[in-house]
């Protein structure tokens, strides 16, 4: 299944998106436990932004904070999906550093609130770079 880092740490301005991705993640973990003994593997890939035409076409509608982290390639996400399908992992977060940060912010919500303005500022700068790159 393909989730999102926003399902691990809520994305301001995208409550519905974050909520559905959190539900998908919980479903994947529960289902993985239910079918494990039958040899079926279930997992979730939780990427941040993916460098595709879709995100670049919608860049003005995407929250700045999304661009505070490196974008993954579609190929890297596909590789992660294959890793899940082979049963090597239950979850892959991409990029891994962002996965660690959202896990930390889950346990320490005040840290998330403290970091948010800094991540928005970084994301704004990166967003401008992406706009120029694709101009």
Describe each region flagged by the PLM.
Residues 4:
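Residue(s) in the substrate-gating loop at a strand-loop-helix junction
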Residues 34-96:
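SDR active-site lid
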Residues 7-9:
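Conserved catalytic-site region of short-chain dehydrogenase/reductase
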Residues 23, 30-31, 35:
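Conserved alpha-helical elements of the SDR catalytic core
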Residues 20:
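Active-site helix of classical SDR
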Residues 11-15:
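Active-site loop immediately N-terminal to the catalytic Tyr-X3-Lys motif
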Residues 69-70, 75-135:
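C-terminal tail/cap regions
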